[in-house]
Amino acid sequence: MALSMYHYIENTWNSEEWKKSVLRQRLIKWRKEPSIVRLAKPTRLNRARSLGYKAKQGFVIVRVRVRRGGLNKPRPNKGRRPKRMGVYGYSPAKGYRWIAEERAARKYPNLEVLGSYYVGEDGLYKYYEIVMVDPSHPVIKSDPKHKWLQDPSNRNRVFRGLTSAGKKVRGLRKSRGLKGTVRYKWNRKQKEREEKKRHEASKYYKLQEYDKIPGK
């Protein structure tokens, strides 16, 4: 069976030699450009097509740049130790990809976010490409695969966590549900602490033959 074009695109993208040569030059160019840029065509065609992208009217590709780290945390103007300022060491509750989708949706309020994918990162930023659709375009209205975006229940879907990035952060992936998320594990461990049970991170957690755990 012959391999498809998308197979070779994926192999090229995962090649370390290609990342050091081509992608590095692209990142240098992207850093000089604005944070939100509309593109003529997707950088990763295989990922865009997997999200439902079609090369026809009504589809728009946008590249969004998001700063890495804890983003902008307001620094308190009242007196306290710098250690207690609460500025450093905190990560945003949302994923970077979800943040990028929301920024693209605010930039183009007449479009709806269909999906997004990662395209690169450097020491300061992460870059994502957002697949957006114009639900009012006649081509989209007549497309049976994408006319569902006209429904009022799908309006501003990115701000309600209905995209893939939003569902991932909310722990709503169909493959696992809420039971495998970080929030679920934290709540479970917190309940064990309150009930004074053996914590799963304990060194002697699996040593059931001991009546008394050493050091406790």
Swiss-Prot record:
Any Pfam family hit: Ribosomal_L15e
PROSITE patterns referenced in this protein's UniProt entry, alphabetically: RIBOSOMAL_L15E
Record keywords: Ribonucleoprotein, Ribosomal protein
GO cellular component, one term: cytosolic large ribosomal subunit
SUPFAM superfamilies: Ribosomal proteins S24e, L23 and L15e
The keyword Ribonucleoprotein belongs to this UniProt entry's keyword annotation: yes
Single GO term (MF): RNA binding
InterPro entries, alphabetized: Rbsml_eL15_core_dom_sf (IPR024794), Ribosomal_eL15 (IPR000439), Ribosomal_eL15_arc (IPR020926), Ribosomal_eL15_CS (IPR020925), Ribosomal_uL23/eL15/eS24_sf (IPR012678)
A single BP term in Gene Ontology: cytoplasmic translation
Family classification: Belongs to the eukaryotic ribosomal protein eL15 family.
NCBIfam families attached to this UniProt entry: PRK04243.1
Protein name according to UniProt: Large ribosomal subunit protein eL15
Organism (species): Saccharolobus solfataricus (strain ATCC 35092 / DSM 1617 / JCM 11322 / P2)
Lineage: Archaea, Thermoproteota, Thermoprotei, Sulfolobales, Sulfolobaceae
